């Protein structure tokens, strides 16, 4: 079709342009993190015999990284099990996803003291913009939530007014905090026991790094349904419970959360499983792979 011809022409043009840029700047290494934009740059570098590395954040690799895997020197993966999607196994190194140092520096006890939390804590959010399905379910849940559980709910700025309007006239107890945006996510994540969220790669890496039990609602609106694969990896590791958009209701969420809070052994086991899946030193591991390639 005409569209396919146009795409092929754009890809060829991208290769020519990136090859020219790489020849001009002479980089020591070219790194790709997926996405079609990285394709021409990494492929051109590989053709010019410049060291190349790709980092796959998700459990299910994107198309660009799968194509590039044949040409690059090193493939860094973030989830154990992802190697089965690549044909060139000898290039694969398990590094995990880097997480922010700040989030690692705040302890559970310090964060709870800072936020004045004394009860089991649930942190719920759908990313910086919010997620409608998570908000719809949380809206029903907080109306009947147990007062023995502290709840921090980040709605996202675009949903906040609508949600506060829906709760008008309802006297929510002090244990429920509803915020348009969680500015101190380091403290909120550190102080929590259970996290209710989507299943983006970095979010899950932070959940594991902090050792939190997770109730995951993967977004069905992402490429290759990669959030479902990410969530399944944590579920398989014993760190998460998955509730799909088609299945979750406020009552089911309440039952799941109460079940974890009331079963301290299960909750603690999920936290420990999350910690076991963590690669808090991912940045160092990736750096070492870069160093190997640039020093060879």
Model-derived features: positions:
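An amphipathic, basic-hydrophobic alpha-helix
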Residues: 1-29
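Acidic donor-binding loop of glycosyltransferase active sites
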Residues: 27-29, 190-205, 212-213
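An aromatic- and histidine-rich active-site surface loop
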Residues: 27-48
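Active-site-proximal region of nucleotide-activated glycan assembly enzymes
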Residues: 46-109
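Donor-nucleotide binding loops and adjacent catalytic segments primarily
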Residues: 108-195, 227-232, 236, 243-252
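Short hydrophobic beta-strand element within catalytic cores of glycosyltransferases
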Residues: 197, 213-224
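A short, well-ordered alpha-helix in the C-terminal region of glycosyltransferases
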Residues: 266-280
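C-terminal alpha-helical cap of glycosyltransferases
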Residues: 279-296
């Amino acid at each position: 079709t005409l569209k396919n011809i146009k795409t092929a022409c754009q890809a060829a043009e991208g290769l020519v342009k990136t090859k020219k840029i790489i020849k001009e700047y002479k980089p020591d290494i070219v790194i790709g993190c997926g996405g079609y934009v990285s394709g021409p740059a990494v492929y051109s570098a590989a053709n010019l015999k410049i060291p190349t590395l790709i980092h796959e954040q998700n459990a299910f690799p994107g198309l660009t990284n799968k194509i590039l895997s044949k040409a690059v020197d090193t493939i860094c993966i973030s989830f154990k099990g992802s190697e089965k999607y690549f044909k060139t196994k000898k290039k694969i190194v398990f590094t995990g996803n880097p997480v922010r140092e700040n989030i690692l520096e705040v302890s559970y006890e310090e964060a709870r003291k800072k936020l004045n939390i004394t009860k089991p804590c649930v942190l719920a959010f759908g990313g910086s913009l919010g997620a409608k399905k998570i908000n719809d379910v949380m809206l029903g849940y907080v109306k009947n939530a147990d007062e023995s559980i502290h709840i921090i709910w980040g709605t996202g700025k675009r949903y906040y007014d609508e949600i506060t309007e829906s709760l008008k006239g309802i006297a929510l107890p002090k244990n429920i905090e509803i915020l348009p945006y969680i500015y101190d996510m380091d403290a909120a994540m550190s102080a929590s026991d259970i996290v209710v969220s989507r299943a983006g790669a970095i979010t899950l890496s932070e959940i594991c790094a902090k050792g939190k039990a997770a109730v995951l609602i993967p977004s069905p609106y992402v490429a290759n349904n990669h959030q479902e694969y990410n969530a399944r990896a944590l579920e398989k590791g014993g760190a998460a419970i998955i509730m799909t958009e088609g299945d979750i209701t406020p009552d089911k969420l309440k039952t799941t959360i109460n079940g974890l809070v009331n079963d301290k052994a299960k909750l603690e086991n999920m936290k420990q499983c999350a910690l076991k899946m963590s690669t808090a030193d991912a940045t160092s591991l990736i750096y070492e792979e870069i160093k190997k390639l640039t020093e060879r």
